[in-house]
Amino acid sequence: MCRLMLTGLEKVYRDKKQEKKAVQNLTVSFEHGVYGLLGENGAGKTTLMRMIVGILKPTQGQITYDGIPIRQLGGTYRNLLGYLPQDFGYYKDFSAVRFLNYIAALKAIDSKIAKERIDNLLETVGLTEARNKKLKTFSGGMLRRIGIAQALLNEPKILILDEPTAGLDPRERVRFRNIISALGKNRIVILSTHIVSDVEYIADQIMIMKQGAFIKTGTQAQILEPVAGCVWKCVVSEKEAEELNATYAVSNLRGSEREGQVE
């Protein structure tokens, strides 16, 4: 099993007035499985992912795959990657099939192989019936699913997903998590988000990022162990929720099935 290794990785942005460390001295290794990169907006998640896929060059440190620096691997490494950025470009008047064929051509995939993969991927992401519809008619959830499909066209060994559930409704979010969970069995999947529920049930490892550094890493059980017995879930009125939110550290609020109440 090949390993993706980040060693002493840093990214510094400089201008005439100041410098900002977007990523600070990260060392971590990835093998097959789903890795949840959790952190608020601006924590450095996107910068880290752009370095992993080779869009950004680290200021310091290195990234290796199977012991070889990715800069030396060049196109060989890029062929191992599948990438879904937070905002990915597409031609609005293309149908789903035409768009995926276009991406397959860019990735130099043989047309016969591409046809079979596209059919399989559309089924995997639940878009078979929408295959001939134009992308401009797709909902946000459908676009994220076609984004997953394009990232998987080259059967990547490393799948990078940057805020893949952004803007999705709860039902689409669940569907997306189910898709991602199945993908980590034979590849490295790195998923970034600022929403805890996106990773708590599907990630083999969770990495919490703040100000460019990892402040906590481990399994879900390991992450939650220090707060065992200190977290409660309850159903309260909206007024009580406001009072509790002002007094305690509330991690999540959502509407309850009971009218006028929240969980």
Predicted regions and their residues:
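A short, flexible loop at the N-terminus of ABC-type nucleotide-binding domains that lies
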Residues: M1-L6, E10-N25, E31, L73-G74
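Walker A (P-loop) phosphate-binding loop of ABC-type ATPase nucleotide-binding domains
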Residues: E40-G44
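Helix-to-loop junction immediately C-terminal to a conserved catalytic motif
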Residues: V53
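Conserved ABC transporter NBD signature motif
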Residues: G61-Y77
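Conserved ABC ATPase "signature" region
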Residues: N101, A105, K112-A130
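Catalytic Walker B motif of ABC-type/P-loop ATPase nucleotide-binding domains
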Residues: L159-D162
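ABC transporter nucleotide-binding domain
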Residues: F176-V262
